[in-house]
Design a protein with these regions (language model features):
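Residues on the lipid-exposed face of transmembrane beta-strands in outer-membrane beta-barrel proteins
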Residues: 44-48, 76-82, 95-97, 125-129, ...
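Detector for outer-membrane/organellar transmembrane beta-barrel domains
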Residues: 73-80, 88, 161-164, 171-257
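Outer-membrane beta-barrel "beta-signal"
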Residues: 21, 28, 152-188, 308-320
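Transmembrane beta-strands of outer-membrane beta-barrel pores
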Residues: 28-32, 60-66, 80-82, 95-103, ...
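Repeated loop/turn-to-beta-strand initiation elements of outer-membrane beta-barrel proteins
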Residues: 21-23, 52-58, 86-91, 129-139, ...
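Flexible, solvent-exposed loop segments that connect beta-strands
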Residues: 58-70, 101-119, 218-234, 260-274
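Residues that define the transmembrane beta-barrel architecture of outer-membrane proteins
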Residues: 36-42, 70-76, 117-123, 151-155, ...
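Sec/Tat signal peptide C-region and signal peptidase I cleavage site
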Residues: 13-19
Length: 320
């Protein structure tokens, strides 16, 4: 998970920098296979401007659902671009590593699925029209390369917005050194299979703020049941925070998840197995008042035994 550690460093640096923006793009994807399967594509990006002509971005990319593949991933790209005007066009090219998650099949049927992970490259070209405000319109052509199953090409369009600076006093109200936070959470968990089975998930989270940009958490989590199978455990994560508005904080976490997992979906008395897996999360927290917080997180559990899952949790908690 070298990429995720590099993103931690990137976001730590960006928390004290100025020109940053977020974007949401959507469009079409074509898999570079003989069948030429097509599907949708979505990109959520966060960009840090390093220089007049250079930027670096962190991207979540969903490559859609071509036949026998549900693939998404995380990419980091270094961009070279023309000067960015207050209003008008800029053009750029980006390249970097891409860590993918692919729900695929071992025998050519939807009943047998596998969760494959690995490294590839992500490369992009874009054209951006900067509006008079902080908003902009973007068209992007992206290509994933070096992945065993297939490469893919995506054409997407969407909007972006430059993030303004938040005064330090406001940042400290959202998260200050020594703060403690207890959250009660509930939501849905989704098995990364072709059926995408869902169940009700719950969590109890404790957080400790080390700096206004770094937190640590321990989460007791129950991912619920799929038929007779059930998984629950405890995760510990380190979080990086970036103020988005005066009351809202964006966050990214990475850590380990120790769990007890029952894999047999037909026998409720089947033996449970113990596993430890990486877990990566992104989220947003809202400061309701001096003590109460609301939070939404999405976590990806990354296993080595074909049992990846997405866990979405929404809740509220008390800061003290």
């Amino acid at each position: 998970m070298r990429y995720l550690y590099s993103i931690f460093t990137f976001l730590t640096i960006s928390s004290i920098a100025h020109a940053q923006d977020a974007s949401l793009l959507a469009g079409a994807m074509r898999a570079d296979t003989d069948a030429g399967n097509t599907s949708f594509a979505v990109n959520v990006g966060y960009t840090q401007h390093l220089h007049k002509y250079f930027s670096v971005s962190a991207d979540y990319l969903n490559e859609g659902h071509p036949k026998f593949h549900h693939r998404d991933g995380l990419g980091a790209q270094l961009w070279a671009h023309t000067a960015i005007p207050e209003r008008g066009w800029s053009f750029g090219a980006g390249f970097g590593p891409y860590y993918y998650f692919d729900t695929t099949t071992g025998n050519g049927s939807f009943g047998d699925y596998r969760n494959e992970h690995g490294w590839g490259q992500l490369m992009s070209l874009n054209a951006i029209y900067h509006l008079h405000s902080r908003a902009y319109v973007e068209a992007r052509l992206s290509h994933t390369h070096g992945i065993t199953s297939h490469d893919s090409t995506m054409l997407m369009v969407g909007m972006g917005y430059e993030l303004g600076s938040v005064p330090r006093a406001i940042r400290l109200e959202n998260a200050d050194r020594g703060d403690n936070l207890v959250m009660l959470l509930a939501g849905r968990s989704i098995v990364n299979s072709f059926k995408s089975e869902t169940s009700t998930s719950t969590g109890l989270e404790y957080r400790r703020t080390f700096t206004p940009n770094i937190e640590g958490s321990v989460i007791l989590m129950n991912e619920g049941k799929v038929d007779a199978a059930e998984r629950k455990g405890v995760s510990a994560q380190v979080w990086l925070l970036r103020p988005f508005t005066e009351r809202t904080v964006l966050e990214m976490g990475f850590g380990a998840y120790a769990m007890r997992d029952q894999l047999d979906r037909t026998d409720p008395h089947a033996e449970r197995e113990s596993h430890v897996a990486p877990i990566a999360s992104i989220g947003m927290r809202y400061r309701i008042d001096d003590h109460w917080r609301a939070q939404l997180t999405w976590s990806r559990v990354i296993t080595n035994y074909e049992r990846d899952s997405d866990v979405f949790l929404l809740g509220a908690g008390y800061a003290f």
